[in-house]
């Protein structure tokens, strides 16, 4: 049946470890982790309705609200909200998913608030199995960042990724991943780039989800940073890259 989730969360103070000259502190560092234990005054309420069906489509709706406590100066207190819709369809040969999100006074998270900022995100992603051995994954994404008070960083971001994969057996597979991204700024031109990666992989099962995995890869790409070069006042805006290496991936 339909399920409803709701939660309240608080953000803790960030902490950047620094060496201290005070010899009374045995460790001589200000903190030992990436965050402290204090409340920094930023809160969020999150909610999600899921397990809904619209014919063959699975539907999820979520809403998040961010606000500040008195720990934040009155002049800096700000509210933010975010709403999203996820539509997905699963069959024997794969899955397709559409994600739509609108944010007010925030972008990716209602913790990090910016006055008069609106952000829109939309993506289409999925995977398809032609056979058990031949599969492909893909993603199309769009992101619109619009700050009504400061338009110097306003931009539209377009991205596309496709990854055909062939599994020779339960251990060995070959993947070819191609990606393209363009960031179109309202001021100062755009940045764009592409990347192509060929990898030979060793894993414990047949499928892209199996880990741990040992990967040997070669990656080539090019980035044309016209916007960044204009902002920084540099003449060189194009970067070429070729990388060869190996990596080990694992998750639990």
Predicted regions and their residues:
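Outer-membrane beta-barrel "beta-signal"
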Residues: 198, 210, 236-252
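A contiguous, mid-protein "functional segment" used to position or interact
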Residues: 192-194, 198-199, 213, 217-221
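Outer membrane beta-barrel
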Residues: 1-63, 218-223
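Detector for outer-membrane/organellar transmembrane beta-barrel domains
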Residues: 45-185, 192-196
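Short Gly/Pro-enriched loop/turn and capping motifs at secondary-structure junctions
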Residues: 181-185, 205, 220-225
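Outer-membrane beta-barrel biogenesis signature
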Residues: 204-215
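Extracellular loop and loop/strand-boundary signature of outer-membrane beta-barrel proteins
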Residues: 18-36, 71-73, 109-112, 147-150, ...
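Internal helix-turn-beta structural module
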Residues: 215-233
